[in-house]
């Protein structure tokens, strides 16, 4: 009896000692334990998604793919698959399975090192949220205590829901919702039993048990899960047999992007990181942009087609690489496709290798193993490139352009395949709503994979004659009118600084003598612009440009400003053109309309400052001082003293700080009124004439009238010295668009081409705004304005219409007249008494006006 008594005492002491040890261990570990109460308000990492204005997914940013689901949204069969495999006694224990803990402790004691045993789902949840994945006894003890705490805080269903959304399942997929999409491309409710079991088998080793890494291992692991489900009574023998016989059909499925616009979505990403830091990638933000799918894709297609058209007419630069030469042993198909898979694709351009070639046809192998045929129709364009101004002869047979072993580029045109090449030239397009600044479309280059440099917002390029409408606006605000006569004759003036004559020339070098300002802009006469610049003063003109939002540091204070020597981005140019079309208001471009959190709550909604031509909003600069010399006079030798010029310079009242591209939230406000509404109408009317001209002369943008077949549009070409940059900017109802094209290498110019007859409707001659940039503008605007009713230009209050003589700009006194618009009080008062003859002077080769 004494022995039994002592044995009981010893047992009680051991129990007390064990309990005390556990309590002591708990008190020692307790300060190191995190607060499990945070699980009540846990925010799972969810990627940021970027949408178009019409709700189409454009991009997704974030390291972790996750689709949060409630437990009710997860099929019970999938829940049971995880319970059977990971924790069959889940509903019976209180966070810790004593059998599993005993096994882990025994292994640690007898092996001499820590090794993780069977953890419950609650323990796994504790580890995933609060602990590192290291396999140590200390971490295991913490895991146990945390699991017990979690079971006290949360219900079993809450634990399961968190676990099934948190668990890592391979290929950046976190949670069963993301795994279903990544491996099978469908939501969880559409998964088969076999597919659910495949996913449930992943937590043990997601990198090696996933079906994309090893189908054999994935199948074996799936079968283990099915066996556990059968033994636990979750499925029948028939269901088990059927699921076990299924072949796992898994492929990697990227997020379902409806359409891609990487230059714009990269701008969104940067803005979100600026606002929210790294949390932008984790908190499930939904960002809605201002673009729609139809309009944005029209812009991207217009830019790509125009760049490829330019590139083709300048000739073929040859293969990108030669893998084997004619006569050498050819590579086998696997070696070719392995090589091609290392190369990117650029829009419609795919890398390929020529495997066969004869005079009539070539066969090229694509990266996916497909062979395509290249016939003469798809190769005839490929004249050899000699330089930017010279092309070789048109190929007469296929082998004149391609040979076996060459790595080339191809693209599909209809049902046929054409030889292609990655363009050297690049382009950008920006389109905005002139009333509120919403970006309607933005393209920063030919292809984001080729170059991530966003030319729409980052490229400062000389604007050439695209600047003339702004300068003529300044001149008219100083006293000129659309009927003012300026002398279109050559200029030669000594430049003391340069030590030579400065002789600006028209392009083409034709001169018409005295002409009206409207014609000077419509035909883009350089010397006429220079005379207007001299009349109003360089400093006045340079300062006036800031009204249109152009940064002062990019504006030169020399007469070359008249020819477009200032450098702006396409976005800045589009913003400036909006002022001329919206009644004179400087709107702020923005591209984010709304930001929501992961629950759909609105965090930000744009409230842009709008233009309101009908509102009585004064011009913030006040009235510009008029010059009495800027009346209807011959401007050949007009000059104003420096003192007069400086006294008339309007001081900018707009801050020149960084102009944010995201409109600020707040009450409705109006954009600054920077030029008066009647004046903006005059320049808008003049831009219309740049397209449609007048009897006897054609505007430089005439192709837009032909292509769009509507008269409520206006625009201006722009070409810089040596054609290094080409522009076309203009408006239509509710839209302003600017297009730029040129080389990133400033040493290269756009050159010229000769007609070959091999390309349908090929443009030839000197490149420039009308030939190189305008085709993209025309194609885009035609798509955007399709179905939009024509809206004739309607003069605002303060505009009067007067019949004038075309040659003198005075009141008409005969048949050679037209109606002209004037700001009330500036119309001519004298009748024309004679007609001034027009002298045409031709100083060289004729090529495209700019």
Predicted segments — roles?
Residues 1-51, 89, 108-109:
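N-terminal type II signal-anchor transmembrane helix
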Residues 18, 27-44, 192, 306-319, ...:
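Beta-lactamase-like hydrolase cores
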Residues 22, 27, 111-367, 532, ...:
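Non-catalytic, structured segments within soluble enzyme domains
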Residues 67-72, 389-399, 422-427, 450-470, ...:
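Short active-site loop at a secondary-structure junction
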Residues 78, 289, 293-296, 302, ...:
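A penicillin-recognizing enzyme superfamily signal
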Residues 82-83, 229, 299, 359, ...:
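Active-site SXXK
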Residues 91-101, 174-177, 236-241, 476-496, ...:
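Short, well-structured active-site flanking segments
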Residues 110-135, 186-189, 256-257, 435, ...:
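Conserved catalytic neighborhood of penicillin-recognizing serine enzymes
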């Amino acid at each position: 009896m004494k022995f039994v008594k002592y044995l009981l005492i010893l047992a009680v002491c051991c129990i007390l000692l064990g309990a005390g040890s556990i309590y002591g261990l708990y008190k020692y570990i307790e300060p190191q334990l995190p607060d499990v109460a945070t699980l009540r308000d846990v925010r799972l990492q969810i990627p940021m998604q970027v949408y178009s204005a019409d709700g189409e997914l454009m991009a997704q940013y974030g390291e972790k793919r996750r689709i949060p689901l409630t437990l009710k949204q997860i099929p019970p069969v999938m829940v049971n698959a995880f319970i059977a495999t990971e924790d069959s006694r889940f509903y019976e224990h209180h966070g810790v399975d004593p059998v599993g803990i005993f096994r882990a402790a025994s292994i640690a004691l007898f092996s001499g090192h820590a090794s993780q045993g069977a953890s419950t789902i609650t323990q796994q949840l504790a580890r995933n949220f609060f602990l590192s994945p290291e396999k140590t006894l200390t971490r295991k003890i913490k895991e146990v205590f945390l699991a017990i705490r979690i079971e006290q805080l949360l219900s079993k269903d809450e634990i399961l829901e968190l676990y099934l959304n948190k668990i890592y399942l391979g290929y950046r997929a976190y949670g069963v919702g993301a795994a279903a999409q990544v491996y099978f491309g469908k939501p969880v409710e559409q998964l088969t039993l076999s597919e659910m079991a495949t996913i449930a088998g992943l937590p043990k080793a997601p990198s090696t048990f996933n079906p994309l890494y090893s189908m054999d291992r994935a199948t074996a692991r799936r079968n283990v899960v099915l066996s556990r489900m059968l033994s636990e009574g979750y499925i029948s023998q028939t269901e088990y047999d059927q699921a076990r016989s299924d072949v796992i059909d898994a492929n990697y499925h990227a997020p379902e992007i409806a359409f891609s616009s990487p230059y714009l979505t990269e701008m969104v990403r940067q803005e979100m990181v600026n606002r929210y830091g790294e949390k932008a990638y984790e908190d499930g933000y939904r960002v809605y942009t201002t673009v729609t799918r139809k309009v944005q894709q029209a812009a991207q297609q217009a830019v790509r087609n125009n760049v490829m058209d330019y590139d083709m007419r300048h000739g073929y630069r040859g293969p990108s690489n030669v893998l084997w030469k004619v006569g050498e042993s050819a590579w086998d198909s696997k070696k070719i496709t392995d090589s091609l898979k290392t190369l990117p694709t650029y829009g419609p351009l795919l890398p390929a290798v020529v495997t066969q070639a004869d005079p009539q046809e070539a066969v090229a192998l694509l990266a996916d193993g497909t062979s395509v045929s290249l016939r003469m129709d798809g190769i005839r364009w490929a004249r050899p490139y000699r330089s930017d101004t010279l092309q070789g002869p048109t190929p007469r047979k296929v082998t004149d352009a391609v040979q076996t072993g060459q790595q080339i580029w191809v693209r599909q045109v209809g049902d046929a395949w054409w030889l292609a090449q990655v363009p050297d030239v690049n382009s950008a397009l920006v389109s905005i709503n002139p009333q509120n600044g919403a970006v309607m479309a933005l393209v920063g280059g030919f292809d984001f994979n080729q170059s991530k440099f966003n030319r729409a917002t980052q490229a400062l390029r000389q604007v050439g004659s695209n600047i003339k409408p702004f300068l003529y606006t300044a001149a008219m605000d100083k006293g000129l009118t659309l009927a003012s006569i300026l002398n279109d004759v050559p200029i030669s003036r000594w430049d003391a600084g340069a030590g030579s004559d400065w002789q600006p020339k028209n392009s083409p070098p034709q001169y018409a003598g005295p002409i009206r300002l409207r014609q000077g802009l419509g035909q883009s006469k350089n010397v006429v612009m220079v005379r207007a610049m001299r009349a109003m003063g360089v400093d006045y003109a340079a300062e006036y440009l800031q009204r249109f939002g152009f940064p002062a540091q990019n504006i030169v204070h020399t007469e070359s400003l008249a020819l477009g020597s200032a450098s702006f981005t396409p976005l800045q140019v589009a913003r400036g053109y909006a002022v001329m079309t919206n009644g004179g208001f400087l709107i702020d471009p923005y591209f984010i309309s709304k930001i929501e959190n992961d629950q759909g709550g609105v965090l930000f909604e744009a409230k842009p400052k709008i233009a309101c031509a009908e509102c009585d909003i004064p011009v913030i600069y006040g009235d510009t001082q008029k010059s009495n010399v800027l009346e209807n006079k011959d401007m050949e030798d007009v000059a104003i003293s420096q003192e007069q010029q400086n006294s008339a310079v309007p001081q900018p009242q707009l801050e020149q700080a960084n102009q944010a591209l995201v409109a600020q939230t707040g009450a409705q406000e109006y954009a600054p009124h920077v030029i008066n509404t009647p004046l903006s109408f005059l320049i808008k009317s003049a831009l219309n004439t740049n397209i449609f001209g007048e009897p006897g002369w054609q505007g430089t943008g005439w192709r837009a009238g032909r292509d769009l077949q509507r008269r409520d549009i206006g625009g201006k070409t722009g070409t810089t010295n040596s054609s290094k940059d080409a522009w076309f900017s203009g408006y239509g109802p509710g839209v302003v668009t600017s297009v730029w094209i040129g080389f990133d290498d400033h040493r290269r110019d756009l050159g010229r081409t000769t007609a070959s007859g091999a390309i349908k409707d090929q443009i030839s001659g000197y490149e420039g705004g009308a030939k190189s940039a305008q085709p993209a503008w025309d194609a885009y605007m035609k798509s955007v304005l399709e179905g939009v009713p024509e809206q004739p230009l309607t003069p605002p209050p303060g505009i009067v219409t007067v019949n004038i003589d075309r040659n003198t700009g005075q009141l008409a006194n005969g048949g050679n007249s037209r109606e002209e618009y004037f700001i009330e009080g500036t119309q001519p008062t004298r009748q024309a008494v004679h007609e001034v003859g027009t002298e045409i002077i031709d100083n060289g080769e004729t090529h495209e006006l700019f």
